[in-house]
Amino acid sequence: MANKKSPAATWPVANGEYVLGNPESCVGVITLGSHGLDQAAVDAGAALSGPCHTENLGIEKVVANYISNPNIRFMIIAGSEVQGHITGQCIKALYENGIGDDGGIIGAKGAIPFMENIGKEPVERLQRQIIDCIDLIDVEDTAKIAAAIKNCTSQDPDAIDEEPMVVDLEGGEAVANTESTSMKPTSPEMALLEARMKIVSEKMNEAAMIAKFNSGYYNGKIQGIAIGLFLSILVFSLL
């Protein structure tokens, strides 16, 4: 029988729209932007399942909840990708590459993939603890998700040989086996607004470049006509 550890007393330490299962399960499921998949995932054997909409605070909550339960060793990313945020790809990039000194997720393609409240230590703990990240992004077939969960539970490798790590999401500090955690107020709506502002800015820059090109083309054309007229007058004056 697999060796298990008790998760943090307040697990899951970060609030969210989660459905909880057996805390001794070795599988956690992230359903990204989809709805109606979480209960089926838990019924199939997941420790918890819930959505993740944003590539910053949303992912921070995932990290906090996973590393505070040493039993979770597999992470399944399923459900529809969140447009603009590209949260699923950002989670994979975090697991595979970690974060830079500026808190940015290395290789992430989302709009604002920065860990403001999570430092390198919790991210590295997640990378040690999770032995496999299963990519089912854009899969909403509950049978396929359930099959992936059962495949993971059949390979249960025991809990990681470390104590639960609880992260203060406001201070970014990691504490082993403590109970307190706090949130910095951020909303998915604000992150979406920032993402849209970034897109608008990029479109404005593209429009400015096109206008600059067109302006240069038009000015060059006028100059060419003027030079042609001057040369024509000069030639006729010499005849």
UniProtKB/Swiss-Prot annotation:
Q: How is the cofactor bound?
A: Binds 1 5-hydroxybenzimidazolylcobamide group.
Where in the cell is the protein located?
Cell membrane
Give the cofactors, semicolon-separated: 5-hydroxybenzimidazolylcob(I)amide
Which residue stretches are annotated as topological domain Extracellular?
Answer: 239
Would you indicate the residue range of the signal peptide?
none
> What InterPro entries is this protein classified in?
MeTrfase_MtrA/MtxA (IPR030688), MtrA (IPR005778)
Catalysed conversion reaction: 5-methyl-5,6,7,8-tetrahydromethanopterin + coenzyme M + 2 Na(+)(in) = 5,6,7,8-tetrahydromethanopterin + methyl-coenzyme M + 2 Na(+)(out)
GO biological process terms, alphabetically, are: methanogenesis, from carbon dioxide; methylation; one-carbon metabolic process
The top EC class, named as a word, is translocase
Show which residues sit on the Cytoplasmic side of the membrane: 1-215
**What metabolic or biological pathway is this protein involved in?**
One-carbon metabolism; methanogenesis from CO(2); methyl-coenzyme M from 5,10-methylene-5,6,7,8-tetrahydromethanopterin: step 2/2
Which residue ranges traverse the bilayer? 216-238
Q: Which Pfam families does the record match to this protein?
A: MtrA
Keywords from the UniProt entry: Cell membrane, Cobalt, Membrane, Methanogenesis, Methyltransferase, One-carbon metabolism, Transferase, Translocase, Transmembrane, Transmembrane helix
Gene Ontology cellular-component annotations: plasma membrane
Q: What binding partners and quaternary form does the record give?
A: The complex is composed of 8 subunits; MtrA, MtrB, MtrC, MtrD, MtrE, MtrF, MtrG and MtrH.
Instruction: Report the protein name in the record.
Output: Tetrahydromethanopterin S-methyltransferase subunit A
Native source organism of the sequence: Methanococcus maripaludis (strain C7 / ATCC BAA-1331)
